[in-house]
Regions:
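Short, Lys/Arg-enriched N-terminal segments with co-localized hydrophobic residues
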Residues: 5-23
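Acidic/aromatic-lined carbohydrate-recognition and catalytic surfaces
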Residues: 24-187
Protein backbone atom coordinates (compact mmCIF):
# COMPACT_ATOMS: atom_id res chain seq x y z
CA UNK A 1 0.00 0.00 0.00
CA UNK A 2 1.38 3.41 -0.89
CA UNK A 3 1.62 6.16 1.65
CA UNK A 4 0.96 9.84 1.11
CA UNK A 5 3.03 12.20 3.21
CA UNK A 6 1.19 15.38 4.01
CA UNK A 7 2.08 18.36 6.17
CA UNK A 8 -1.45 19.79 5.97
CA UNK A 9 -3.85 16.90 5.72
CA UNK A 10 -7.00 18.93 5.08
CA UNK A 11 -5.47 21.02 2.29
CA UNK A 12 -3.01 18.55 0.78
CA UNK A 13 -5.13 17.85 -2.29
CA UNK A 14 -5.39 21.54 -3.17
CA UNK A 15 -1.63 22.18 -3.08
CA UNK A 16 1.03 21.40 -5.70
CA UNK A 17 2.99 18.23 -4.93
CA UNK A 18 6.14 20.06 -3.86
CA UNK A 19 4.27 21.95 -1.10
CA UNK A 20 2.84 18.95 0.73
CA UNK A 21 5.43 16.26 0.27
CA UNK A 22 8.17 15.67 2.80
CA UNK A 23 11.53 16.76 1.35
CA UNK A 24 13.65 13.89 0.05
CA UNK A 25 16.47 14.59 2.49
CA UNK A 26 14.07 13.78 5.36
CA UNK A 27 13.13 10.42 3.84
CA UNK A 28 14.84 7.10 3.48
CA UNK A 29 14.72 7.58 -0.27
CA UNK A 30 15.05 3.90 -1.19
CA UNK A 31 11.91 3.15 0.86
CA UNK A 32 9.75 6.22 0.45
CA UNK A 33 10.62 7.84 -2.87
CA UNK A 34 8.23 8.15 -5.78
CA UNK A 35 9.99 6.17 -8.51
CA UNK A 36 9.17 6.53 -12.19
CA UNK A 37 10.56 4.05 -14.72
CA UNK A 38 11.63 5.39 -18.09
CA UNK A 39 12.06 3.16 -21.11
CA UNK A 40 14.23 5.58 -23.11
CA UNK A 41 13.37 4.19 -26.55
CA UNK A 42 9.77 5.41 -26.31
CA UNK A 43 9.87 8.18 -23.70
CA UNK A 44 10.82 11.39 -25.55
CA UNK A 45 12.47 11.92 -28.93
CA UNK A 46 14.54 15.12 -29.05
CA UNK A 47 15.78 14.97 -32.64
CA UNK A 48 12.82 13.67 -34.64
CA UNK A 49 14.29 10.28 -35.58
CA UNK A 50 11.43 8.40 -33.95
CA UNK A 51 13.53 7.06 -31.07
CA UNK A 52 13.53 8.44 -27.53
CA UNK A 53 16.89 9.59 -26.25
CA UNK A 54 18.77 11.06 -23.28
CA UNK A 55 18.29 14.65 -24.45
CA UNK A 56 14.57 13.93 -24.66
CA UNK A 57 14.58 12.69 -21.07
CA UNK A 58 16.54 15.76 -19.96
CA UNK A 59 13.96 18.02 -21.63
CA UNK A 60 11.15 16.52 -19.51
CA UNK A 61 12.88 16.47 -16.10
CA UNK A 62 11.21 19.67 -14.87
CA UNK A 63 7.81 18.21 -15.74
CA UNK A 64 8.63 14.97 -13.90
CA UNK A 65 9.70 17.03 -10.88
CA UNK A 66 6.33 18.85 -10.94
CA UNK A 67 4.62 15.45 -10.90
CA UNK A 68 6.44 14.68 -7.65
CA UNK A 69 8.96 12.20 -9.02
CA UNK A 70 11.94 11.68 -6.69
CA UNK A 71 13.77 8.93 -8.57
CA UNK A 72 13.96 7.86 -12.19
CA UNK A 73 14.58 4.17 -12.82
CA UNK A 74 16.27 4.25 -16.21
CA UNK A 75 15.98 1.09 -18.32
CA UNK A 76 19.27 0.08 -20.01
CA UNK A 77 20.97 2.71 -22.15
CA UNK A 78 24.33 0.95 -22.49
CA UNK A 79 25.79 -0.05 -25.87
CA UNK A 80 23.89 -3.09 -27.11
CA UNK A 81 23.00 -4.91 -30.33
CA UNK A 82 19.47 -4.51 -28.93
CA UNK A 83 18.38 -8.09 -29.51
CA UNK A 84 16.77 -8.03 -26.04
CA UNK A 85 15.59 -4.40 -25.67
CA UNK A 86 18.98 -3.28 -24.38
CA UNK A 87 19.33 -5.99 -21.75
CA UNK A 88 22.00 -7.67 -23.93
CA UNK A 89 24.82 -5.25 -23.11
CA UNK A 90 27.90 -5.30 -25.33
CA UNK A 91 29.74 -2.41 -23.64
CA UNK A 92 29.03 -1.33 -20.06
CA UNK A 93 31.15 1.80 -20.53
CA UNK A 94 29.29 3.42 -23.39
CA UNK A 95 25.82 4.63 -24.33
CA UNK A 96 23.78 3.08 -27.15
CA UNK A 97 24.25 5.42 -30.10
CA UNK A 98 20.52 5.90 -30.72
CA UNK A 99 20.16 7.29 -27.17
CA UNK A 100 23.02 9.77 -27.44
CA UNK A 101 26.49 10.04 -25.96
CA UNK A 102 28.18 9.82 -22.57
CA UNK A 103 28.18 13.63 -22.61
CA UNK A 104 24.39 13.60 -23.11
CA UNK A 105 24.10 11.21 -20.17
CA UNK A 106 26.29 13.44 -17.97
CA UNK A 107 24.17 16.49 -18.86
CA UNK A 108 20.93 14.63 -18.11
CA UNK A 109 22.32 13.40 -14.79
CA UNK A 110 23.54 16.88 -13.79
CA UNK A 111 20.13 18.39 -14.59
CA UNK A 112 18.34 15.64 -12.65
CA UNK A 113 20.56 16.21 -9.62
CA UNK A 114 20.05 19.98 -9.89
CA UNK A 115 16.30 19.30 -9.61
CA UNK A 116 16.80 16.87 -6.72
CA UNK A 117 15.95 13.80 -8.80
CA UNK A 118 17.98 10.65 -8.33
CA UNK A 119 18.72 8.32 -11.25
CA UNK A 120 18.83 4.55 -10.73
CA UNK A 121 20.39 2.73 -13.66
CA UNK A 122 19.05 -0.65 -14.72
CA UNK A 123 22.39 -2.48 -14.68
CA UNK A 124 22.30 -6.03 -16.01
CA UNK A 125 25.30 -7.94 -14.68
CA UNK A 126 24.12 -11.56 -14.69
CA UNK A 127 24.50 -11.83 -18.47
CA UNK A 128 25.94 -9.94 -21.42
CA UNK A 129 25.54 -9.82 -25.16
CA UNK A 130 27.28 -12.45 -27.25
CA UNK A 131 28.95 -9.41 -28.84
CA UNK A 132 30.55 -8.27 -25.55
CA UNK A 133 34.35 -8.39 -25.79
CA UNK A 134 34.59 -10.77 -22.81
CA UNK A 135 32.34 -13.31 -24.50
CA UNK A 136 34.10 -12.91 -27.84
CA UNK A 137 37.38 -13.65 -26.04
CA UNK A 138 35.90 -16.58 -24.08
CA UNK A 139 35.00 -18.33 -27.36
CA UNK A 140 38.59 -18.38 -28.62
CA UNK A 141 39.85 -21.30 -26.53
CA UNK A 142 39.05 -23.49 -23.54
CA UNK A 143 41.91 -21.93 -21.56
CA UNK A 144 41.12 -18.30 -22.35
CA UNK A 145 41.15 -16.12 -19.18
CA UNK A 146 37.57 -14.99 -19.93
CA UNK A 147 36.28 -18.55 -20.35
CA UNK A 148 35.14 -18.77 -16.70
CA UNK A 149 33.09 -15.59 -17.07
CA UNK A 150 30.49 -17.74 -18.85
CA UNK A 151 29.03 -21.21 -18.44
CA UNK A 152 30.41 -23.73 -20.93
CA UNK A 153 29.65 -27.46 -21.03
CA UNK A 154 30.60 -30.51 -23.09
CA UNK A 155 27.95 -32.17 -25.24
CA UNK A 156 26.10 -35.09 -23.67
CA UNK A 157 25.60 -37.99 -26.05
CA UNK A 158 26.17 -35.62 -28.98
CA UNK A 159 23.46 -33.21 -27.80
CA UNK A 160 22.95 -30.27 -25.44
CA UNK A 161 24.28 -30.83 -21.89
CA UNK A 162 20.71 -30.99 -20.49
CA UNK A 163 17.12 -30.14 -21.34
CA UNK A 164 17.06 -26.60 -19.98
CA UNK A 165 15.01 -24.14 -21.98
CA UNK A 166 15.71 -20.52 -22.79
CA UNK A 167 13.32 -17.89 -21.39
CA UNK A 168 12.38 -17.05 -24.98
CA UNK A 169 11.88 -20.66 -26.08
CA UNK A 170 14.19 -23.30 -27.49
CA UNK A 171 17.27 -24.73 -25.82
CA UNK A 172 19.24 -22.71 -23.27
CA UNK A 173 22.40 -24.14 -24.83
CA UNK A 174 24.10 -22.89 -27.98
CA UNK A 175 26.75 -24.95 -29.73
CA UNK A 176 30.07 -23.23 -30.43
CA UNK A 177 32.12 -24.91 -33.15
CA UNK A 178 35.42 -23.21 -32.23
CA UNK A 179 35.89 -25.18 -28.99
CA UNK A 180 33.30 -27.92 -29.63
CA UNK A 181 31.31 -26.96 -26.52
CA UNK A 182 27.96 -25.44 -25.59
CA UNK A 183 27.47 -22.12 -23.79
CA UNK A 184 24.48 -21.29 -21.62
CA UNK A 185 22.15 -18.51 -22.78
CA UNK A 186 18.96 -18.16 -20.78
CA UNK A 187 17.76 -15.24 -22.91
Amino acid sequence: MSQVYSRKVNSACAKPAQEWRIPMEEKKWWKEAVVYQIYPHSFMDSNGDGVGDLRGIKSRLSYLKLLGIDVIWLSPVYQSPNDDNGYDISDYRDIMTEFGTLEDFDEMLAEAHKLGIKIVMDLVVNHSSDEHRWFVESRKSKDNPYRDYYIWREAKDGKEPNNWGSCFGGSAWEYDQTTDMYYLHMF
